[in-house]
Amino acid sequence: MYRALTHDIEVTVEPYYLEEQSDPDDSRYVWGYRIIIANHSDVAVRLMTRYWHITDENGQVDEVSGPGVIGEQPLLNPGDTYEYSSGCPLDTPSGVMFGHYSMEAEGGETFNVAIPAFSLDSPGLVRTLN
């Protein structure tokens, strides 16, 4: 698992390879990821937007942004957690994702919360280091 803590908001990511949705012969590799957002602060916050920076093993970058996550803009009161799952297809057997959520505190303050960088690696992938 991968974790980041920003402004007392913790983001935990657990990626997993979706073999049944992948087709390596057609250069299609798909991962799912489970995210848990925990509000360790003493104020309520709402997740307003998301931003993803996705890089495949060839260095091809895809940026994704938009309102909320999976169609929701969840409100997290102090001590609350919010969990969701989503996915990411790539044309290569590995890649890396990271990003941030834009949050709004109950007083109207907005701030970004880091989504930690995490690796997308196909099972059985052999890496060679020079």
Swiss-Prot record:
Residues 3-127 form the ApaG domain. InterPro entries: ApaG-like (IPR050718), ApaG_domain (IPR007474), ApaG_sf (IPR036767), Uncharacterised_ApaG (IPR023065). It holds the Pfam family DUF525. It comes from the Bacteria. This is Protein ApaG.
